[in-house]
């Protein structure tokens, strides 16, 4: 995840504000953003460009943590308390992470790692975000946006890409340190068919010593299932939907999208809104579309 950001400019005419001041942005009475001023840039014509961030910005603080048998929700609560941040509705992720040890990492990276481990173990994907000044965690399946974007509704342009360049792997090797032998126990799964098609694309990672053989083997199979494919990415430009945010599911209706026809709910990874001269537009990136 990344902090929510608000950028705007104003003419300096008797307005006085400083870094750290709170900022609220609402549209038609709906609170869209609550954050704080971090950057001010002024030009010779007294126009001030302002950049504000929400509460997730403070999670860039670096720290070291050792968690054993704690759920992602419990980890978020402890970090929020340590940083004196406000926690709101945090959904119970249910699965205790056997071990999570991270040194001198940003708290946002620590939380992201906890959620990634939860995804690999349970298959459940969660969205972590600031909801009007309160840290929130929800399963993506419960965050369905209203509205449709497509050829007959709001869509103005899109960019669709297919590749095997960045996230595609047809061989997974997981290494678990073994203190008794002084060597790593290596678990490997491959797809010989796709190795013949694309060449050997291998991912190698170390895993926690607390995981048993069955858990490591299951993790390797899950990783191969996810990475062993061609990836499809979609970027969309459209007229704006107020309140749409990253982490929500949105219905997209784009027939004849290259090699596929798209009509389904899609997860939004990044959303950017622009309000200018009474016109509201948005750009968003869709999570990889799958085979």
Predicted regions and their residues:
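Well-ordered beta-strand positions in beta-sheet-rich domains
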Residues: 31-36, 49, 64, 186, ...
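Assembly/oligomerization scaffold segments
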Residues: 1-59, 149-161, 233
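Short, acidic/charged, Gly/Pro-enriched secondary-structure junctions
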Residues: 9-42, 71-82, 112, 239-265, ...
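Non-catalytic surface loops within mature trypsin-like serine protease
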Residues: 12, 54-56, 89, 178, ...
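Acidic, small/polar-enriched beta strand-loop surface segments
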Residues: 14-15, 112, 116, 123-277, ...
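Residues in well-ordered beta-strands of folded domains
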Residues: 9, 24-26, 38, 51-53, ...
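Glycine- and charge-enriched low-complexity intrinsically disordered segments
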Residues: 68, 283-291
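Charged- and aromatic-enriched interaction segments used to assemble
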Residues: 44-163
């Amino acid at each position: 995840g990344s902090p929510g950001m608000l950028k705007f400019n104003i003419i300096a005419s008797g307005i006085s504000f400083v870094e750290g001041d709170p900022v609220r942005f609402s549209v038609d009475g709906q609170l869209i953003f609550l954050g704080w001023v971090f950057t001010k840039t002024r030009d010779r014509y007294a126009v001030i460009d302002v950049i504000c961030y929400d509460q997730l910005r403070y999670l860039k603080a670096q720290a070291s943590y050792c968690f054993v048998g704690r759920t992602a929700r419990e980890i978020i609560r402890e970090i929020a308390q340590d940083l004196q941040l406000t926690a709101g509705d945090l959904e119970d992720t249910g699965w205790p992470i056997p071990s999570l040890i991270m040194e001198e990492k940003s708290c946002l990276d620590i939380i992201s790692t906890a959620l990634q481990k939860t995804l690999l173990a349970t298959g459940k994907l969660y969205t972590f975000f600031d909801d009007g000044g309160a840290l929130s965690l929800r399963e993506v399946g419960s965050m369905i946006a209203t509205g449709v974007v497509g050829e007959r509704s709001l869509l103005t342009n899109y960019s669709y890409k297919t590749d095997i360049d960045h996230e595609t792997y047809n061989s997974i090797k997981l290494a678990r340190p073994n203190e008794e032998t002084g060597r790593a126990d290596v678990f490997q799964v491959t797809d010989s068919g796709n190795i013949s098609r694309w060449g050997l694309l291998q991912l190698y990672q170390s895993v926690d010593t607390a995981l048993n053989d069955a858990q490591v083997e299951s993790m390797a199979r899950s990783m191969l299932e996810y990475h062993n494919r061609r990836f499809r990415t979609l970027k969309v430009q459209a007229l704006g939907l107020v309140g749409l945010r990253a982490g929500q599911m949105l219905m997209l209706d784009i027939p004849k999208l290259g090699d596929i026809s798209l009509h389904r709910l899609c997860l939004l990874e990044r959303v950017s809104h622009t309000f200018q001269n009474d016109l509201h537009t948005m750009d968003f990136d869709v999570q990889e579309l799958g085979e």
